[in-house]
Amino acid sequence: EIPLIEEAAKAGCEYFCIDAGWYAKGFWWDAVGEWKESRERFPNGLKEVTDYIRSKGMIPGIWLEPEVMGINCELAKTLPDTWFFVRHGKRIYDRSRYQLDYRNPEVREYMTSVVDRLIQEYGIGYIKMDYNIEPGIGTEYDAESPGEGMLEHERAYLQWLDALFEKYPELVIENCSSGGLRIDYAMLSRYSIQSTSDEEDYRYYATIAANSPSGLTPEQSAVWSYPLPEGDREATVFNMVNAMLLRIHQSGRLDKISEEEKDLVKEGLDCYKSIRGDINKALPFWPLGLSAFDDEWTALGLGTEEKLYLSVWRRSGNTPCISIPIPQGKGKEAEVICRYPSFNTSTYEWNQVAGTLSVNFERENMARFYEIKLCKEN
């Protein structure tokens, strides 16, 4: 973790989240549930790492899956069935995990104690809450139907979240849910951030990123940016543009990429920080329509009263040029600048009469981020 922490700090990251596996030395999938650090993995303790994250000016975060216990979790073997979803008199499990029942106050108290320990002992300020099972139709225990048991569990879980945020108002909690599931506003009215996908091909992620504001607010839409050691500078730019108008989840082997790519990551994060104050008050628009995975060109815009921001991607095909309609700009003069990357040499031109921005991307898998200031009509 140390090399990644150092490079993340240099790039300008503000949080550093330790992902799954911190509680086990090896295979852990079916044994989760106690949420205690693995001394084999962290011989000097997890606190050594979280303290180091703090020393680099970042807030430490951690991965947690608070609604499940593995079937081989030692604690689960000692607990009564009232802690879990039950059907036909037996605990139900999916993918080798039991579903915890948050109607039970002991469950809520236990998971609150886990969060308390992570915050108070390790200084955790960010929790990536995952959820990787399908609990089925619900639980029959103490319910007239499985559906009633499910509904009351969900309500109890939301109340638990409310209590956490009341207790720790500065805590940031991400709704990961297996990479973009459970995107509903019962959840999103509480969670700080929503994962949009676990897509591992950054070229496809452009479509997910561009469409995400159709389902959730841009400032909650967490999008991965993960430049690869085998990539080039355009691949790094593509990654950064994917997340620029949303919520950047910076990832990738920042310790393995070239110095030029590191500089581009830092430049991208600096650019994002300079515009993120506008994101939560801007309205999204899709000048090329919603995106499909086989589209050659994709665009996402955010508009405020003062300016427009526009991310443009060329993914494939033999068409190096496109004119992007900006309806609110028709008949208006405009000042257009490429905000990212600073090395940009690809041409672009504003057409006042048509209200279009024409761009020329000389290769596939290119992306650019523009700022458009429309002049007020006389």
Q: How would you name each of these model-derived features?
A:
Residues 19, 61-65, 128-130, 174-176, ...:
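A cross-family glycoside hydrolase active-site/sugar-binding cleft signature
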